């Protein structure tokens, strides 16, 4: 059975389409109209090694919050659909990723339960990257977790510069996601018998 999904989310603020194939290579440059966010979505696709296509528009004349959050929501919905009953997946993934002075650690559980623990919000991260801050990243990941049924822990072990923090976290998230969606058995990875 193909592990694919296509989801569109349209509101008065945004119009986002995500196509996802968990067993294919990345296929398109993201196109949301926000340069740095597109760069991060490209990193997500490349480092997860998943077939991810994201396009959309948003009210960037106000600020990027709605676009970034709604993209996380839509990606989470697409992942949940593509995983189906989650039978056979590894379920867990984790990764450490350095970027210059920054070191990020991300741990992911595709448990069906939504939770985000996002340490960088309690730290003194400074600056932004093309108008994207670590707070925007938090909202992207929160939207993803809430709609994918995922538990995600994000720790920052070193670094405070926003560009490097965002990029290291996004790449660590991608690598954890790659491992968690991998099919490694034919059983459901739960002692409860359901996820």
From Swiss-Prot:
Residues of the signal sequence?
none
Q: Which GO terms describe its biological process?
A: L-histidine biosynthetic process
Q: Which GO terms describe its cellular component?
A: cytoplasm
GO terms for MF: imidazoleglycerol-phosphate dehydratase activity
Reactions mediated catalytically: D-erythro-1-(imidazol-4-yl)glycerol 3-phosphate = 3-(imidazol-4-yl)-2-oxopropyl phosphate + H2O
Q: What is its EC number?
A: 4.2.1.19
Compartmental location: Cytoplasm
Pathways involved: Amino-acid biosynthesis; L-histidine biosynthesis; L-histidine from 5-phospho-alpha-D-ribose 1-diphosphate: step 6/9
Major localization listed first in the record, in broad terms = cytoplasm
Which EC class is the enzyme in?
lyase
This one is known as: Imidazoleglycerol-phosphate dehydratase
Q: Which organism is it from?
A: Deinococcus radiodurans (strain ATCC 13939 / DSM 20539 / JCM 16871 / CCUG 27074 / LMG 4051 / NBRC 15346 / NCIMB 9279 / VKM B-1422 / R1)
């Amino acid at each position: 059975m193909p592990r694919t999904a296509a989801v569109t989310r349209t509101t008065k603020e945004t119009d986002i389409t995500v196509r996802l194939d968990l067993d294919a290579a990345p296929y398109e440059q993201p196109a949301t109209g926000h340069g740095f966010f597109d760069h991060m979505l490209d990193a997500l696709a490349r480092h997860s090694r998943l077939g991810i296509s994201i396009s959309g528009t948003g009210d960037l004349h106000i600020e990027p919050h709605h676009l970034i959050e709604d993209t996380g929501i839509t990606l989470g919905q697409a992942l949940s659909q593509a995983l189906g009953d989650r039978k056979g997946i590894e379920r867990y993934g984790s990764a450490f990723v350095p970027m210059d002075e920054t070191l990020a650690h991300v741990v992911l559980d595709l448990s069906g339960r939504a939770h985000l623990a996002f340490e960088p919000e309690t730290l003194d991260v400074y600056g932004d990257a093309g108008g994207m801050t670590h707070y925007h990243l938090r909202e992207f990941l929160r939207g993803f977790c809430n709609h994918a049924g995922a538990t995600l822990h994000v720790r920052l072990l070193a670094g405070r510069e926003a560009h490097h923090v965002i990029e290291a976290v996004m790449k660590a998230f991608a690598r954890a996601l790659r491992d968690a969606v991998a099919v490694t058995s034919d059983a459901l990875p739960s002692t409860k018998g359901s996820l």
